[in-house]
Amino acid sequence: MAPQTLLLVLVLCVLLLQAQGGYRDKMRMQRIKVCEKRPSIDLCIHHCSYFQKCETNKICCSAFCGNICMSIL
């Protein structure tokens, strides 16, 4: 009876991990940092997130109007 109980507890633990989203790959998620320079109000129309990527030579950073794409040059 004890091995069956242990197996049931193990299966329940695995199911609970899946219900919480499973294992998370921290390298896959991009961290959005605060912009190094204060952006102009014109840049506030170019919103981004780690789902919506910015163009080349631009990074997604957090500003007063939300997450925006800002030039790194």
From Swiss-Prot:
Q: Which residues form the signal peptide?
A: 1-21
Task: Tell me which residues make up the WAP domain.
Answer: 28-73
GO BP, sorted A to Z:
antibacterial humoral response; innate immune response
Q: In which tissues is it expressed?
A: Ubiquitously expressed.
Localization recorded for this chain is: Secreted
Sorted UniProt keywords: Secreted, Signal
InterPro entries named among the record's database cross-references: WAP_dom
**Gene Ontology molecular function:** serine-type endopeptidase inhibitor activity
Question: Would the keyword Kinase turn up in this protein's UniProt record?
Answer: no
Give the domain of life. Eukaryota
Keyword Signal applies: yes
PROSITE patterns cross-referenced by the UniProt entry: WAP (PS51390)
Spell out the coiled coil positions from the record: none
One Gene Ontology cellular component term attached to this UniProt record is: extracellular space
Its protein name is: Protein WFDC10B
